[in-house]
A protein has these predicted regions:
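N-terminal Sec-pathway targeting helices
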Residues: 1-18
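Substrate-recognition/specificity elements adjacent to catalytic centers across diverse enzyme folds
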Residues: 10, 23-280, 286, 299, ...
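Structured, non-membrane catalytic/scaffold regions adjacent to prosthetic-group chemistry
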Residues: 48, 126-156, 267, 272, ...
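Hydrophobic alpha-helical segments
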Residues: 430-532, 607-611
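Terminal end segments
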Residues: 511-575, 663-793
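Glycine- and hydrophobic-rich flexible loops that cap the catalytic core of alpha/beta enzyme folds
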Residues: 256, 297-312, 316-321, 325-469
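Charged, long alpha-helical assembly modules
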Residues: 604-687
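Proteins synthesized as precursors that undergo proteolytic processing into mature forms
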Residues: 115-119, 140-141, 401-404, 408-435, ...
């Protein structure tokens, strides 16, 4: 027995020693791929030495003699800190993820390959100006030098047992294309959904269920419209329709890629310079989406966020002008029905162009550990065939995303713009995914316009699919700078964007509709800004705009809270529904999306349950006709609230006795959902549901013990939807900043995650906690802690 015990002890000790040894080996192995922070290293191609100074958060200040040297150095540090992320981003749009992850990525690659972004990227570079091309080439050479300077390849490639492919200049365009397909739908499902609604219930259904202008809109020009009446039973009547199953996962469209931006004129700031604040709402990825940087060269200083894989400051300030973006929801795509000829590979061209032949584009997807996958896409003069309409006609996608002239690196010009007017001109030349841009200059002026390329439609508004074969409906190129709407009225005090419809009238006709966000968030920002300029007419500072960004009051739910309490009071407990604690939990606070709030969670669930029970049966025929039907983009708060208030029986599913019956079932849905997670109403805080769940791409590939240090902490988050502080489990503000140009030292910034993508780096999540808590850090880099000198020899 003693012998067995001794051997057991020896085995345990050996296992402990082996585990410790493996841990030390793994740590040492991972350390080899950490970025170089101090000392000096040669970087070929520099005209003179460049210094990279990092502060306590790892934010670099890059000092050089020329913009080309800055680009080369930026490429170097991007590669050292973020190369694997850059690689995933270029491969996402190129359709090359299967080379890393095997069969599991083939479906994603097929969808991307149809766009042929790598071919387009090469054409974009051929069209680029010499200045832009030189910057991209310098950046690319810097990336490859930075990758080569690591002692070991980035750790992700060691785990995948692969060698990283060198960076190419065209990959910078592919990174932009990946952002494009994040912000825009390369299947144009919004237009196809509108057409499906039209085909299912007729044109009379559109004003109510897909209204372009509503009474609650928060446009910059104040444009609104009376609410459309509910369609009568002659248009739509579901009372006798067969009951349908409810969706298990409710997506009401409240957490979609978007953003907030706001600007205050210099008349209301302490400095006299205008001020801009920006928080771009995206998936909270690991590592974070952005890479902070400050560039200093030849009397220029530009500070802001870069996108690893590109050489640009995307949003920030240059001392004269500050700018920020939000997704514009401008219509940049149209579906074109294809009229086939007698030959299967031929179709009728527009007007008098006659019979044209389809172009058959073949592609091969390389798959790690498996055979290559071949795919074929038919292209027309308008774009690729991506589906069929209700008459079984092929549909081609005509999209600015397939046009080389819609991509460029002209945003570089923002770095040297000195006035809002100059910045507007740069925005109109920029080839980026079409965005709202708010601009603030040091003289106090603020302005809104769109940055990027907008199609110039002739003969139609682009909302519904129309035939192009007659030649009277087409695109006449892209809008010129003179044709592109600008909003900067004399004496304007503040501006705001939150993915809402920005303008009405002729401007709306030019920009079109790709699914604007519900207006509640924009209206709340507008009203917050109005309150600021009223209470602090000449005293607004950056922290004031941060307070707007962090506004988590659920104003859009106030009426729903009252409705919920009324329904609870009217329900009969004897019917087996346990209402104990529910009223008290709903009344606990003033309805903020605070992590500790029970009221916000419960009222929100009530509204979502009602959304589900009302709209699922109404749109069931649309989903049957078009499985990817997206009513989340269409129906407004006005639509749902009007139905709940007016209670039309012809729009009530047959499995409900009355609208009150439906609302009572929605109340019961709350209780059912709480029972599933074993939480009582008084314990059902919002934070328990809204817990950050952002995971590293390798989380699904490694044991959970190893991935804990890779993923972001599972913090209970404040913030929700339909309010300025947008926050979900994996979605929210990808950064927040507020700054006045010329006064950057007073600016503030916060961002999820850190600068480095390496889990052993002290900068892996540096600054993350400040973002979670809404605590500002400085906009400019702080005191230097590390200095790396990049030398010419």
């Amino acid at each position: 027995m003693k012998t067995v015990t001794r051997w057991t002890i020896r085995i345990v000790i050996a296992l402990i020693v082996l585990t410790v040894a493996l841990g030390f080996w793994a740590h040492h192995f991972l350390e080899q791929s950490l970025a170089v922070l101090d000392g000096s290293t040669h970087l070929s191609g520099l005209s003179s030495s460049v210094t990279v100074e990092r502060d306590n958060l790892g934010v670099p200040t890059i000092r050089g003699k020329s913009r080309l040297d800055i680009a080369r150095a930026l490429g170097f540090i991007h590669a050292q800190d973020r190369f694997f992320q850059m690689d995933l981003t270029r491969r996402r749009s190129a359709g090359e993820l299967s080379e890393l992850f095997g069969k599991r990525a083939v479906a994603v690659d097929k969808a991307a390959r149809r766009n042929e972004f790598r071919v387009l990227a090469k054409n974009v570079l051929l069209r680029a100006s010499k200045e832009e091309r030189d910057v991209v080439e310098a950046y690319t050479e810097g990336v490859n030098a930075g990758l080569a300077s690591l002692k070991s390849k980035p750790f992700e490639y060691s785990l995948l047992r692969l060698t990283p492919a060198p960076w190419k200049a065209e990959d910078c365009v592919l990174v932009a294309a990946s952002m494009l397909i994040t912000l825009q739908d390369d299947q144009n499902r919004y237009e196809q959904s509108l057409v499906t609604l039209h085909d299912t219930y007729g044109r009379k259904s559109l004003p109510f269920f897909a209204s372009l202008i509503t009474p609650d809109d928060a446009a910059l020009d104040g444009s609104t419209a009376p609410g459309a009446p509910i369609p009568g039973p002659d248009v739509i009547n579901i009372r006798d329709a067969k009951p349908v199953a409810l969706n298990s996962l409710i997506d009401d469209g409240s957490l979609m890629p978007g953003s907030n931006s706001m600007a205050i004129s210099g008349a209301h700031t302490t400095t006299g310079a205008a001020m801009v604040a920006n928080d771009m709402h995206l998936e909270i990825s690991v590592p974070g989406r952005w890479y902070r940087a400050c560039f200093i060269w030849d009397n220029n200083r530009v500070t802001g966020v870069t996108l690893a894989g590109t050489p640009l400051i995307i949003a920030g300030s240059n001392g004269h002008v500050a700018w920020g973006f939000t997704n514009s929801c401008v219509d940049t795509a149209d579906m074109v029905p294809i009229a086939r000829s007698e030959q299967d590979n031929e179709y009728h061209g527009p007007g008098t162009s006659g019979i044209l032949k389809m172009s058959r584009h073949e592609s091969v997807i390389l798959v790690k550990g498996s055979d290559p996958v071949k795919m074929t896409t038919d292209w027309t003069i308008w774009g690729p065939i991506i589906g069929k309409d209700s008459d079984n006609r092929p549909l081609a996608l005509h999209w600015t995303g397939h046009m080389a002239e819609a991509f460029n690196f002209s945003l570089l010009g923002m770095e040297k713009a000195t006035t809002a007017d100059e910045a507007i001109e740069v925005a109109h030349q920029a080839g980026i995914p079409i965005q709202n841009i708010l601009i603030a200059d040091s003289a106090g002026k603020i302005a809104w316009t769109v940055a990027g390329k907008v199609p110039k439609r002739v003969g139609f508004d682009g909302r519904l699919t129309v035939p192009w074969v007659y030649g009277d409906r087409h695109w006449d190129g892209l809008l010129s700078s003179k044709e592109t709407p600008v909003w900067s009225p004399t004496g304007v005090d503040y501006l705001w964007t939150a993915n809402q419809r920005i303008l009405g009238g002729e401007a709306l006709q030019l920009l079109g509709d790709a699914g604007y966000a519900r207006p509640a968030r924009a209206a709340q920002i507008r009203d917050d800004l109005k309150n600021l300029v009223t209470t602090k007419p000449k005293g607004i500072v950056p922290k004031d705009l941060l307070s707007v960004q962090l506004d988590d009051r659920a104003l859009a739910l106030i009426k729903w809270k009252e409705l919920l309490l009324n329904q609870i009071a009217a329900m009969d407990p004897e019917k087996g529904i346990d209402l104990d604690q529910l009223p008290e939990a709903v009344k606990t606070d003033d309805l903020r999306a605070d992590a500790s709030s029970t009221a916000y969670r419960l009222v929100r669930e009530f509204k979502l349950a009602t959304w589900n029970r009302v709209f699922t049966p109404i749109f069931a025929p649309c989903v049957e006709a078009y499985p990817e039907f997206q009513y989340r983009h269409m129906v407004s708060e006005y639509t749902l609230w009007t139905l709940v208030q007016q209670k039309p029986m012809h729009l009530l599913a047959a499995n409900y006795l009355s609208w009150d019956d439906l609302l009572h079932q929605s109340v019961n849905d709350i209780l059912v959902s709480l029972k599933k997670v074993h939480v009582s109403p008084k314990e059902a805080t919002w934070g328990k549901q809204n817990t950050l769940a952002s995971k590293h791409p390798f989380s699904a590939l490694l044991p959970s013990l190893l991935t804990r240090s890779l993923n972001f902490p599972a913090d209970q988050m404040s913030g929700g939807d339909d309010m300025p502080r947008i926050q979900g489990q994996t979605f929210g503000a990808s950064e927040r900043f507020a700054v006045s140009p010329g006064h950057e030292e007073e600016g503030i910034f916060e961002m999820p995650g850190g600068q480095s993508a390496h889990p052993l780096s002290s900068y892996y999540i540096a600054g993350h906690e400040a973002w979670v808590k809404g605590e500002p850090t400085a906009f400019l880099p702080g005191k230097t802690e590390h200095v790396l000198t990049l030398t010419t020899q």
